[in-house]
A protein has these predicted regions:
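N-terminal glycine-rich FAD/FM-binding segment characteristic of electron-transfer flavoproteins
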Residues: 1-169
Length: 169
């Protein structure tokens, strides 16, 4: 079972306790040593699995995740991505949403340049309101979107950010 697929059930009965468990280590396992460590950055904003709002970038943002973050920041949203965006190296793999990434259930999902391929949308089935901004009017994401804008994300997103700033005074 993947995280975020089902609601968490209330605990019943007596509280559980944890006991330490000693595991013997073989000589071969003890000989293993760390040869390198690589730091990876994390997507900005709250954790994807816990975020109430998630702004996701897909192929249509063409690598411009600063654009995605520009909308996520005023909404205090997590930044996510499609597999294509991660495969292209535009954002770290920890931001990937879908079959081979995270499963999320935000109250608000905003997809920027996301086509809506099933390997991505399977990871957002628990989303409340889905907003799609994509220049392809035939993109499958519009079938599941509550609100959709057919347009170029590089033109639409700056207008949204400007309007958010105006509304917040």
């Amino acid at each position: 079972m993947r995280p975020g697929i089902a609601a968490v059930a209330a605990a019943e009965g007596a509280p559980l306790t944890a006991e330490p468990l000693e595991v013997p280590v073989s000589a071969e396992a003890a000989a293993v040593r760390l040869v390198s460590r690589e730091a990876t950055s994390v997507a900005s904003g709250p954790a994807l699995s816990e975020a109430r709002t998630v702004v996701v970038g897909g192929r249509g943002v063409d690598g411009d995740f600063d654009l995605v973050r520009s909308l996520a920041q005023p909404l205090d949203a997590a930044v996510g991505a499609t597999r294509v965006a991660c495969d292209e190296g535009w954002i770290e793999r920890s931001a990937q949403i879908g079959q081979t990434g995270e499963t999320i259930s935000p109250r608000l999902y905003i997809g920027l340049g996301v086509s809506g391929a099933v390997h991505h949308t399977s990871g957002i089935q628990g989303a409340g309101t889905v907003v799609a901004i994509c220049d392809d009017s035939e993109a499958p994401i519009f079938e599941m979107a509550d609100f959709g804008v057919v347009g170029d994300v590089t033109e639409v997103v700056p207008q949204l950010v400007e309007e958010l700033a105006r509304l917040r005074g």
